[in-house]
Amino acid sequence: MNLPAATALFTPSWHAELELAYARCGATTRPVLRRHLGPLRVQKHLYAEGPEVCQHIIVHPPGGIAGGDRLAISARVDSGAWAQLTSPGAAKWYRATGPASQTLNLQVAPGATLEWLPQETIVFSAAQAELTTRIELQGDARLFYWDIIALGRPASGERFEQGHFQAHLDLYRDGRPLWHERQRIGGGDGLLDSPIGLDGQPVFATLLVTGEIDSELLERCRALAHPVRGDLSQLPGLLVARCLASEALQARAWLIELWRLLRPALLGREARPPRIWNT
């Protein structure tokens, strides 16, 4: 339903929490904790790849995030378990008179694997979006994490002219930092068009994968034919991929192709895209 502008700006805020935990029981990864407060939910867990990988789809029923909304998501993957978390569609941050926030805390135990593969986040012009992500890995825990951000609504010709987008991302292994990132982009900011910023591209994406790959696979990743401006960097114990794109679908397609190449090499399993991505 489309609300008049005045109504949309003053819709009551949501405070929502979702807490998840996964454990290995024999040969099966099972959800052992699923607690929610407010409109955040997960759908029934799936085993599309067999019992070892537990897939959950996180949904936010109101359909979007507005001023005053506060979302908190935490997920813990215990030793030997494998969880894959995704979303049914784009997360939308609407224009608002005050900030909205999302806090994400992910913990992965030794021998465990977490894939965090949400669909894109669309930040409308005049939204005030503030995202904080903290990921803690222990021992040989494995991670495949991505995020896709679209500022404004490129498909509708809307530029990000007002409001702000802020994101903090921290990744640790055994308490030692692997990756720290701080972003803050204001509506109409010069960084949106600067060659040292987004260079006129409204969409940017980040991929973090634990592990290291050989030069041959790195070149195969770099040679992917896609209409994005992307590259990869191999750091000690961490592979980082970044891209700029004119559309979120382009960035997502690039990340999925990287996932198809990297998942067998770094996680030991062929990539099988969740069915929800095709709906």
UniProtKB/Swiss-Prot annotation:
GO terms for cellular component: cytoplasm. The keyword Disulfide bond does not apply. One of its GO terms (molecular function) is nickel cation binding. It comes from the Bacteria. InterPro entries: UreD (IPR002669). It is found in: Cytoplasm. Pfam families: UreD (PF01774). Keywords: Chaperone, Cytoplasm, Nickel insertion. The keyword Cytoplasm applies. PANTHER family: UREASE ACCESSORY PROTEIN D (PTHR33643:SF1). UreD, UreF and UreG form a complex that acts as a GTP-hydrolysis-dependent molecular chaperone, activating the urease apoprotein by helping to assemble the nickel containing metallocenter of UreC. The UreE protein probably delivers the nickel. Required for maturation of urease via the functional incorporation of the urease nickel metallocenter. Belongs to the UreD family. This is Urease accessory protein UreD. The gene is ureD.
